[in-house]
Amino acid sequence: MKYIQTDQILDIPEGVTVDIKARVVKVTGPRGELTKDLKHIDVTFNKINNRAIKITVHNGDRKHVAALRTVKSLIANLITGVTKGYKYKMRFVYAHFPINVNIIKKDGQDYVEIRNFLGEKRVREVKIHEGVTMEISSTQKDELIVSGNSLEAVSQNAADIQQICRVRNKDIRKFLDGIYVSERGTIVEEI
């Protein structure tokens, strides 16, 4: 079944501007600016006023309508990023060998360096994405805080760190060591 026209309306909060040129969305807010290229998705954008955007799909089937809702969510994530930012907290889990995590600079690029994982000599390094800041928590032992404006960059960095600390060739029910995401949220907490 084809839907002749399907609309989604996205409200823009105060202090945020959204510019759309040739399906490249640029969102500017108090925390900075984010850009997302949506040229591969066949949707139409109309600014109702400066406070709302109408996203439309013409003659779309179920997959196109689902893509419409995806586009709305992506832009909503950009708006949240430039207003509140995103923060992931990661905890180090180990039974015997304490995991040693440092943030290092190498060739002008920042890396997270993971040592002594399961007592291994191998040093694991994860590149920190652009626009993402990492710090080792001063209040909580064995905690890494990943924060930034782009949800994609922050969550991908957290996933990269969690993935590089996977236990291989052992029973994962017994060997629970690793670095796991313990908390997700925004930098600016809602009251």
Curated annotation (Swiss-Prot):
Which family does this protein fall into?
Belongs to the universal ribosomal protein uL6 family.
Q: Which Pfam families match?
A: Ribosomal_L6
Q: What GO molecular function annotation could you give as one example from this UniProt entry?
A: rRNA binding
Asked whether the keyword Cytoplasm is assigned, the reply is: yes
Q: Where does the source fall among the domains of life?
A: Eukaryota
Predominantly, its location class is cytoplasm
Protein localization: Cytoplasm
Q: Which GO terms describe its cellular component?
A: cytosolic large ribosomal subunit
Keyword set, alphabetical order: Cytoplasm, Ribonucleoprotein, Ribosomal protein
Q: What function does the entry list?
A: Component of the ribosome, a large ribonucleoprotein complex responsible for the synthesis of proteins in the cell. The small ribosomal subunit (SSU) binds messenger RNAs (mRNAs) and translates the encoded message by selecting cognate aminoacyl-transfer RNA (tRNA) molecules. The large subunit (LSU) contains the ribosomal catalytic site termed the peptidyl transferase center (PTC), which catalyzes the formation of peptide bonds, thereby polymerizing the amino acids delivered by tRNAs into a polypeptide chain.
What is the scientific name of the source organism?
A: Candida albicans (strain SC5314 / ATCC MYA-2876) (Yeast)
Q: Gene3D superfamilies given for it?
A: Ribosomal protein L6, alpha-beta domain
Indicate what this protein is called per its UniProt record.
Large ribosomal subunit protein uL6
Spell out the coiled coil positions from the record: none
Subunit and partners: Component of the large ribosomal subunit. Mature ribosomes consist of a small (40S) and a large (60S) subunit. The 40S subunit contains about 32 different proteins and 1 molecule of RNA (18S). The 60S subunit contains 45 different proteins and 3 molecules of RNA (25S, 5.8S and 5S).
Biological process, per Gene Ontology: cytoplasmic translation
Respond yes or no to whether keyword Nuclease is given for this record: no
